[in-house]
Amino acid sequence: MLDVNFFDELRIGLATAEDIRQWSYGEVKKPETINYRTLKPEKDGLFCEKIFGPTRDWECYCGKYKRVRFKGIICERCGVEVTRAKVRRERMGHIELAAPVTHIWYFKGVPSRLGYLLDLAPKDLEKIIYFAAYVITSVDNEMRHNELSTLEAEMMVERKAVEDQRDADLEARAQKLEADLAELEAEGAKADARRKVRDSGEREMRQLRDRAQRELDRLEDIWSTFTKLAPKQLIVDENLYRELQDRYGEYFTGAMGAESIQKLIETFDIDAEAEILRDVIRNGKGQKKLRALKRLKVVAAFQQSGNSPMGMVLDAVPVIPPELRPMVQLDGGRFATSDLNDLYRRVINRNNRLKRLIDLGAPEIIVNNEKRMLQESVDALFDNGRRGRPVTGPGNRPLKSLSDLLKGKQGRFRQNLLGKRVDYSGRSVIVVGPQLKLHQCGLPKLMALELFKPFVMKRLVDLNHAQNIKSAKRMVERQRPQVWDVLEEVIAEHPVLLNRAPTLHRLGIQAFEPMLVEGKAIQLHPLVCEAFNADFDGDQMAVHLPLSAEAQAEARILMLSSNNILSPASGRPLAMPRLDMVTGLYYLTTEVEGDKGAYQPAGQDSPETGVYSSPAEAIMAADRGVLSVRAKIKVRLTQLRPPAEIEDALFGHNGWQPGDAWTAETTLGRVLFNELLPLGYAFVNKQMHKKVQAAIINDLAERYPMIVVAQTVDKLKDSGFYWATRSGVTVSMADVLVPPRKKEILDSYEERAEKVEKQFQRGALNHDERNEALVEIWKEATDEVGQALREHYPADNPIITIVDSGATGNFTQTRTLAGMKGLVTNPKGEFIPRPIKSSFREGLTVLEYFINTHGARKGLADTALRTADSGYLTRRLVDVSQDVIVREHDCQTERGIMVELAERQGDGTLIRDPYIETSAYARTLGADAVDEAGNVVVARGEDLGDPEIEACLAAGITQVKVRSVLTCTTGTGVCATCYGRSMATGKLVDIGEAVGIVAAQSIGEPGTQLTMRTFHQGGVGEDITGGLPRVQELFEARVPRGKAPIADVTGRVRLEDGERFYKITIVPDDGGEEVVYDKLSKRQRLRVFKHEDGSERVLSDGDHVEVGQQLMEGSADPHEVLRVQGPREVQIHLVREVQEVYRAQGVSIHDKHIEVIVRQMLRRVTIIDSGATEFLPGSLIDRAEFEAENRRVVAESGEPAAGRPVLMGITKASLATDSWLSAASFQETTRVLTDAAINCRSDKLNGLKENVIIGKLIPAGTGINRYRNIAVQPTEEARAAAYTIPSYEDQYYSPDFGQATGAAVPLDDYGYSDYR
């Protein structure tokens, strides 16, 4: 077998008949499979042991040779080689065909490769191949030319003879007619009888003339066909062909079926044809040039690849190994077989029948029919259903052909090569494990025992609990007591991987240290639920076991959950307190006025109370029950750092040191909370809303090592759960309070609604106006009920606590629960003007319930559709970007992109850019950030973290130049400096990081949160596409719905306002030609934008527009942006538009992820003029390859190729990849493989997908070449331990040999006397 680690490219080509015969171990001659009595394979059949190898290890068919000692012998009785049975998975056979057949992929694919090569229309080709027309294969022009006059004379003689014969016959008939008429006249017959005789005579003469004319026409037809006869000419009329064959057979050859195609290919001169086509392309125009270009693609492919086009017509068909198309016996003695066996049997049956017919010398028509059937059976074997009706099995099910085995989700690529089942894995339901540390998970004992079985067995033998592996296995199966102790020992420090489907981003698989737990459910740490998107309502998770030391090291260092706190999409922590924990910490840090033991200032006759000398004293007071944790107190602190402003005031420039005392006015709860934070973190004296907690953890992640952050979030989790329990937050019906003012509020609005109804009935309002008015009224009513609700609820109401703390829910839900549901929409997305006045607490009326179901059902249907769409989008994104890997540290480019940090207002103040988090943050500076005085604030090459951004803003810098993957010049992949900081680690990205896949996951994972809706914007006719459809539209580079024109030039606008359309003319500033935009629908409305004077208003006559400016509402077409403004602008446009959709849903994704995808969309150049290069005009070439080839040509002082950048959608870009393995496993498998085989494509195995398919380590992360051949050396200590010299003491040697030091003994001065 091939060792996958030792080849680095994979080439695919066309197999010739010779190749097929070379691969084969023998010819399959019979359609039989196995003998149904003996169940042994039939000789020479589809499962023959002689061809494919023995069915039992080391045993021949007849049983003469058994056992391994006869290895390699070929039995002289049955001819079977004695070897392993697994060779039946790799040995191929073949079928020798009695007549050649064409390969359906090359004839029927679009475009038809055979048709392009031979310059035949696919329809004509089909007629030839399926025996409906003859084709002329060759003409002896010279001989025909020499003998043309003689042949013409012969033809003239023949024609003369026909004419003479005709004339003679007519003459004789005319005379007979005359005689008959004369006889009738003599008899005095009636005029009627005479007329009948004359008519019949004339009719016969007419028939004579017609017959002769037909004969003459036939001769004319034969002659004209013969004189114009040329190769590749079709003759559909069989009689005409027979005549030509009889008369002029020596001047030409012709045939039908695949044989004729084979002959045409044999005589085809590829080089000459390529030269002719290149000439046509250079000098031709229009359709002719286009056709020549398409044909040259196929011809040049054969010319350059050295493939023989003969491979498109087969003389032999390979038979794949029998184990890959098995036949198995079912219960009840019936057999189940792979469809391929049926298809092969059809081929063999027809082939054998054809051989017999040829031997019998059957008539041509019968032989041709059999050949056609053979062609059809081979077509069905290769690609069933591609032409005509598919061959069906029992129950009218189309049989699965070789092509179907590769295609689609169930095909070989996606089912078995990209998605394999894994050993050492298990799955179970998950429950919460609040007692766990962040890096731990609870593993059920039984599951752990099964997973670690081999490890446990080995350890049992090592510890002498069992004599051998077999008895150890028995011990494990019987679950003896010793087994559990050994299991504890084995799982220590051996991480396991937990995965929850769907794995939408890389945090869907994380490593944990297992802790054994009773029961059968896996226990999961509550803080990782966010990353897995898990909850405990019955979710299941899978466990996988990393086996090798390397795998364990990767799991522990790279995948351990405590090292994966940050989101790879935004760089913000995902392991945040949620739900109960938020409620607990919120409760703990709330300050309640005048609570038990609160601080009281000193009165005239009373000392101040609620003052404590240390947190310990305060805790003691709380334990005694005299102080509430939520009461305000004064406390002296020595171990907590004061907030910045207090620190400056109290401790000056030296700053606070641990042990320095200061007094805080706070609550005991807040002191307890601050004790959870790392030492030296400034005291936070606030109520802990979820957002505040998030900000703190964010800050910790920026400033402290991951291990500290992990410990802190664990402490926050424990404290959160503890205080959530103490707080007694529960929800009961009694907590849902309906505001008493609700009825009077609704009554007042009901009156207003009635007034509107009356106006409508009087005709003062039309239907739409009435609806709008009602919707406004009821929106106000709902808001007012909400306000009344808010005022009526006490602050410590559990529902309000849950909502206010940010734990879950929002105020709208509270209002629905206790106030009123308000307006709902119908399926079209319009508000129904009757509101739902009841709350869920009171219960809905039947009508209210009914109108509420509209929205609810639409929501559910939407979610289901969205999930599938979002998954498909992720799949396409991953496919387009899977080979973007960080390849080097720095590409040394000077280029970069400008990003905004802030906007300067009119009064000179700076307003921080709201999206700085996702644009400038975590990038590398491409040029020094300089303030107005010219001082460098942040130097080039620095990483922009929060402190650096703050420094720039403080220095008044509004924009900086940063490195970006869009301007990176690394050939394949990107460089670390252009990519910048890895969002997941907070450090510069490592070489080998698969940033493409991280980008695809970051964009795809929140896809399910995006809406499916198209938004109705008041009065706009065209819907504005939003949500997921908009993201797809952008990444597929489609022309958007309701596309808006953009200005091609800078100039003044002349606006003509028609009845239904606008006409915009731009008069260019440079005096060039005017640009006219005609028929712009008024429903789309003109664009509002900022004018030169700073005002915002609609585009109007006489305005000045810049190049690329949008003129109407809607979305610009990215292809136009590329044409008008160039690649840089279209990149910025796409990134901005995608971000707009995600920001609308409150999803934070860093720009760099979108840039990685956009870079892949703009990787190619379309060739306009090939110059002196090998490129074909119109072909799409990778930019790096294009530039390299041009440099080479210019160096040889040739003419470089001219090309223009092209924007490709992600599906098209995935299929245009250089890796045929990756493209074939993505979509359109047969088309990709056909194309790759003709071009003899070579896959360099650069991407991840190709390597997964062939089973190599992926070239990313620890799989990149620099880590491939690392040899691990033991340390000195390990070496010393391994090679210690045993102490043999005195029982082995005499005392003279020294005290077991291992020192050499000088034998010369050693006495041998004692031993003699």
Curated annotation (Swiss-Prot):
Gene Ontology CC: DNA-directed RNA polymerase complex
Lineage: Bacteria, Bacillati, Actinomycetota, Actinomycetes, Mycobacteriales
Family statement drawn from the similarity comment of this UniProt entry: Belongs to the RNA polymerase beta' chain family.
Catalytic activity: RNA(n) + a ribonucleoside 5'-triphosphate = RNA(n+1) + diphosphate
Cofactors: Mg(2+); Zn(2+)
Binding site for Mg(2+): 535, 537, 539
Alphabetized GO MF terms: DNA binding; DNA-directed RNA polymerase activity; magnesium ion binding; zinc ion binding
Details of cofactor binding: Binds 1 Mg(2+) ion per subunit. Binds 2 Zn(2+) ions per subunit.
E.C. number: 2.7.7.6
Protein name (record): DNA-directed RNA polymerase subunit beta'
Keyword NAD: no
Biological processes annotated in GO: DNA-templated transcription
Entry-linked PANTHER family: DNA-DIRECTED RNA POLYMERASE, DNA-DIRECTED RNA POLYMERASE SUBUNIT BETA
Residues involved in Zn(2+) 1 binding: 60, 62, 75, 78
Species name: Mycobacterium marinum (strain ATCC BAA-535 / M)
Chain positions recorded as Zn(2+) 2 binding sites: 891, 968, 975, 978
Pfam families found in the cross-reference section: RNA_pol_Rpb1_1, RNA_pol_Rpb1_2, RNA_pol_Rpb1_3, RNA_pol_Rpb1_4, RNA_pol_Rpb1_5
Record's keyword terms, sorted: DNA-directed RNA polymerase, Magnesium, Metal-binding, Nucleotidyltransferase, Transcription, Transferase, Zinc
SMART domains to which the protein is assigned, alphabetical: RPOLA_N
Entry keyword Calcium: no
Top-level enzyme category: transferase
Assembly and binders: The RNAP catalytic core consists of 2 alpha, 1 beta, 1 beta' and 1 omega subunit. When a sigma factor is associated with the core the holoenzyme is formed, which can initiate transcription.
Main function: DNA-dependent RNA polymerase catalyzes the transcription of DNA into RNA using the four ribonucleoside triphosphates as substrates.
